[in-house]
């Protein structure tokens, strides 16, 4: 199950988040591995504006009451290693978007201005409701542009050492998206291999494929052939050569359970007990292995 977007009431700060440059300098050997203690911010900035596209007449866009002012407010963006946060500065609330909920991101250029285009899966806070039946997944289109710089007193301290622009947001989002696996996409495409991310050991027996046995291996009731295996009592047939084994087979007329081991030039350590030997007398001397 993929994580869902959620409403948050606290924006990232220097206590729980560090910029990517600081993280790389402090622990380069763990680069690209999620930190257990703090979030890692790959990109971000303040003074952005979000527009919601409503160009499709077959879709009705609905916005949660907490985010009705999103299109008319200045927002701050945090591209973290775990999610993207859209923070509304005026109402001090934010929307946390997991990367699995962002189906597409792209750069748009209009004259000298750049914009970040996002396709977000419909959720409890921003949704697109089809007015007629459709087979496509419902998404909401967002356009993010750089509007203006806000007063330094209102700027989050995390942005002080970071260049804030649309291109940086796109690069950070693309990098972090690659860290998050979307298992639902493989299930929809029929490519559920239960690999590294989807291993389920409890169901390994029930999900195991059936063993295909050639029909020629299975005899029906009218052609049962019981093969009798005669046990001549010599479990240790190492002393029997091929001629002696063949003679026993010919005399008995049935297959003999024997073992012929070719040990090459290596010597066998210990001794082999024969049937005629006294078990009690030879107990301490037989089969002494090193």
UniProtKB/Swiss-Prot annotation:
Tell me where it resides.
Cytoplasm; Nucleus
Q: Give one Pfam family, short name only.
A: Voldacs
Annotated keywords: Cytoplasm, Nucleus
Domain of life, per UniProt, equals: Eukaryota
GO aspect biological process, one term? spliceosomal snRNP assembly
**Keyword RNA-binding attributed:** no
Q: Which PANTHER family match?
A: CHLORIDE CONDUCTANCE REGULATORY PROTEIN ICLN (PTHR21399), METHYLOSOME SUBUNIT PICLN (PTHR21399:SF0)
Family that this chain belongs to: Belongs to the LOT5 family.
Protein name per the record:
Protein LOT5
Q: What is the lineage of its organism?
A: Eukaryota, Fungi, Dikarya, Ascomycota, Saccharomycotina
